[in-house]
Amino acid sequence: MAFRAAVASGVAMIGVGAYAAQGSSATANASATIVNPIAITKTSDLVFGKLAVGAVGGNVAISTANVVAISGAGTTVSQPVGNAGNPAAAVFGVTGEAGFTYAITLPSDGAVTISDGASHTMAVNGFVSNPGTTGTLSGAGTDSLKVGATLVVGNNQVPGTYTGTFNVTVSYN
């Protein structure tokens, strides 16, 4: 009798512990597509040209279409006719993944100065680009980016050759 009770009790316990939770699973794929990195290379520099400056400075703007505009109240800044020194916007080549759009970041006002190597400087402000703030890479994965700006010429600016650098950044959107 004791054996029957033990067997009956064991069967009862097996029945209690035999219930299992029902589960379900699914499978997902993982993937990645590697694209060409975006890159920018300078093709030509921003050139304001040769300037004659008197007592009153002014602003010399170079558009992305290489158009020179001189402004400022009473300015005596001018470009000698026939000897302007080929003013031109900077040109950059952009390469990357075909058809992708990219953002263009230009220097902010006050961030760029050019110097004659001594203590004389001029600010370069008002940077503009073509395309504007966003470009699109061609089917070949290329684009041309032009950058113009405005040179702030001081009163009685000391003669000399002034140079400096500026950065243009491109990144995928």
Positions of the model-derived regions?
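Short aromatic-acidic-glycine turn motif
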Residues: 111-123
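N-terminal small/polar-rich segments of proteins
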Residues: 19-106, 111, 139-173
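Acidic, glycine-rich flexible loop segments
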Residues: 120-151
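Bacterial N-terminal signal peptides that target proteins for export
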Residues: 1-7
